[in-house]
Each structure stands twice: as structure tokens, then as C-alpha cells.
Amino acid sequence: HWEPYKVGEIVTKGPMVMAGYWNNPEETANQLKDGWLYTGDLAYRDEDWHFFIVDRSKDMIISSGFNVFPAEVDNVIFSHPKVFDAMCIGVPDDYRGESLKAFVVLKPGETCEADEIISWCREKLAPYKVPREVEFRDSVPRSPVGKALRRILREEEMAKRAANK
């Protein structure tokens, strides 16, 4: 039973579900439990059982006890007229547990300050979803098919923070 519009993880079982990860029993144990594949995809359904994927569970940020799906924040920033691309990650925050940091790529010839991006987000998002930090970059990491590679940004950010301690 899955209530309409409630976000949860997609879990599936059947003859076409993979048997496991090649030579990776630890990851297989994390994803397969009693024959059920835990996909890591977070989604909701409507009344007609159409599913809408909102993000990956590994990317979800918990800020002040609230779940934040970074793709939602990415899309708001992407809607700014000066922005070409954007990607958010969670970063450690002593008060909130995690807060959002946005990595923003501007359109050619555009200039923008972090405060402008933060104000844009404040107009469109709940306060706990608004990025606390903005970093402008030439690009954000994506796979060859355009998938957000937040893991790379998290690794870069943690290395920067460790070097500054």
C-alpha cells in the first residue's frame, strides 16, 4: 500500500530483477533483500498509479530535520534567467545537521552574485530548502548521458573542507 503523493523508495521483485552485482557481494546485500530490489529511486504516485521519480535516496539532504530533494532545488536555480546549469549537495552544518550548497554555471556573458541566487530561491522554496552557500563554476559534473554526478561534488567539497581545517 502506497499513499498517493507520499514519497518513498521504489522496491521491486520479479523474474527480471538482477541476481546481484558482479563480484560485489556487499553492494548486492545492500540492494537486494529477500528477493526485493531496493532501487534507491525516491518517487511518489498519483491516484492513477503513475509514478514520478523525484531523486535518489543517496542524494537526499536532511536539513533541520526536513528531507530536501536536491533535484527540486536544482530546478528552481535552473529557472533563473542567468543560469545555464546548477547542482546542489548537502554540506555539514553545525546547527542544521546539513545545509545546501549550490554549484551554479551561468549563461555565457552573464554575471551574478550569490545573494541573487539565494533571493531567487527564497521566493520559490521553503526556508530549509534554500542554499546557504553558492559557488560559481564553469561546469558541474555530469555523466555522458547528462546524469548529475553529485558524488564528485561531495568528494571535492569534503576535500576542500578537510584542507581548511
Residue ranges and their predicted role:
Residues 9, 14, 19-23, 27-30, ...:
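AMP-binding/adenylate-forming catalytic core of the ANL superfamily
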Residues 155-165:
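Acidic/polar alpha-helix N-cap and adjacent early helical turns
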Residues 1-8, 17-19, 29, 33-34, ...:
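Conserved ATP-binding loop and adjacent catalytic segment of the adenylate-forming AMP-binding
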Residues 134-137:
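General small-molecule cofactor/ligand-binding pocket signal
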